A protein has these predicted regions:
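Conserved active-site-proximal phosphate/metal-binding subdomains
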Residues: 52, 57-73, 79-229
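Alpha/beta enzyme core
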Residues: 1-73, 80-99
Length: 229
């Protein structure tokens, strides 16, 4: 839902801008009308909590309905400079990225077996774009997760139904903590977007950012070339 108006007022009084995620144009408009400064249009491809509308459809819908009431950032399925260029072409003011940084060299969560990538990163590096599922098992609300033995267990015919939010998170939080320290990549229970299929090596954040810039420039040059022919 939208942030409470009194919280927005307190943040604004302290000079702090307020951002909120939206999975539909309806949610985005509600955010903008109560004073949210930045609406993050998060498409179906994204990791974690997502709606059912893909970014290519959602972002321009949100841009159109919000108008000039708030800035719009695109999220979901963005991990390269080409995708940044596409998001801006759809009308977004910028992008909101998360999954692409999970395989950064600076990422420091999860067990390590030999001083190399964490077990979490090993699981992410091995995944394809088809290796995610959208389930309620993480928090009680639909969230995109890495497919694993954990998600398979919840998909079994004899598995219980997830509890409503926030009870599901209370139920599984201890299990998530244990799995985060496991040395078995097949048990990793990690929110991640479909972009995981392109996350195939460990790189410093500086290199990730440099490739975003160079990829964006290459994409826009290509468009310029197309226009000039």
């Amino acid at each position: 839902g939208s942030p409470p108006p009194d919280v927005i007022a307190q943040a604004h009084a302290a000079g702090v801008p307020v951002a909120a995620l939206a999975g539909s144009a309806k949610h985005a408009l509600r955010h903008a009308e109560i004073g949210v400064d930045i609406v993050i249009a998060q498409g179906y491809e994204a990791g974690g909590h997502t709606g059912e509308i893909a970014s290519l459809v959602l972002v321009p819908e949100v841009v159109d309905v919000v108008g000039g009431k708030a800035a719009v950032l695109a999220a979901g399925g963005i991990g390269t400079g080409r995708q940044v260029a596409a998001a801006l072409a759809l009308g977004a003011s910028g992008v909101w990225m998360g999954s692409a940084f999970l395989t950064a060299a600076e990422y420091d969560l999860g067990a390590r077996t030999d001083g190399g990538p964490s077990v979490i990163q090993e699981a992410l590096l091995a995944a394809t774009s088809s290796d995610t599922v959208r389930r309620k098992i993480f928090s009680g609300k639909p969230a995109r997760l890495l497919k694993s033995r954990w998600t398979d267990a919840w998909d079994a015919d004899d598995a219980p139904s997830p509890l409503p939010m926030p009870l599901q998170n209370v139920l599984v939080s201890e299990a998530h903590q244990r799995m985060s320290q496991s040395v078995d990549p097949s048990t990793v229970a990690m929110p991640v977007g479909q972009i995981v299929g392109t996350m195939n090596k460990i790189r410093p954040v500086a290199e990730i950012m440099a490739e975003l810039v160079s990829g964006f420039e290459a994409a826009t040059r290509r468009l310029d070339d197309i226009r000039s022919t």
